């Protein structure tokens, strides 16, 4: 089995022995991408941020900005990965940054560019305004730090980005093209263990739950992983290597949520940001609490089930779930 993802207009195929290697290390040391930077090596500063896009059979696209310093390669399987250096000079994000003089020493700039790019793609995908006000800009930048404290010009760039977006340009075309190339590559390999992410859950050639349990039985010391925000710290800060990884995000049932008049059912591997976005529709008063919960790139990776399993004292969903009379099943 291999890991396959798309970056810089080409497919990267890696052996699963590199599952626990960080995306940052691979991009800089193997792919020659120098725009991603290592600052804190623990997902706090955002200098290493990249934009990741995956096909989503329920919503079309899953777009998120993640910290490459703590992102294991396994979790990038069948994804598109964009770095700041991948954007053309005429892109609205680049134009807005230039016209706003939003870069000072430049070390953090690629991460801010990627946060803007993720917001830009999400807005184009949903057909809405990109970053309508200062509060929205601060939320987009919640996972980025500027040591020069040049936030005023960065916020200006965020608020003016839409003015540089030409209506006759299809900015999502590279996304569709990349996903098509990736899907064709996976199908051409004809590996039954390579599940095309473009197919609906009912189209999967194997039952991912059964397959994951089989792998666990064969590799009893392997660790289950979803968002990998805790695991990433083991790798980057403690230099520990697990005895194999099993990605729970390849199980569709664990990454979706459903709600009806009987309540809400949330998959354990669903990202916290997706869960919070859904909650805010019904309980907007939760916004202040939820936005204090890590930065957006962490929330976009970390899962609800992982948060409960890790029992972290600095990022705890349990009080909220208690208040909502939640149950585990």
Question: Over which residues does each language-model region extend?
Answer:
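Conserved SAM-binding loop
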Residues: 147, 224-225
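A short acidic-Thr-Gly-centered motif at the start of a beta-strand
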Residues: 209-219
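Ligand-binding beta-strand-loop-alpha-helix segment within the catalytic cores
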Residues: 270-300
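Alpha-helix capping/helix-boundary segments
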Residues: 154, 230-231
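Structural signature of FAD isoalloxazine-binding scaffolds in flavoprotein oxidoreductases
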Residues: 66-70, 226, 233-258, 267, ...
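Signature of N-terminal electron-transfer/Fe-S-associated modules in redox systems
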Residues: 1-210, 250-254, 258-265, 270-271, ...
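Structural motif
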Residues: 79-80, 104-106, 221-223, 243-246, ...
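A gly/ser-rich beta-alpha-beta helix-loop segment of oxidoreductase catalytic cores
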Residues: 51, 231-232, 289-325
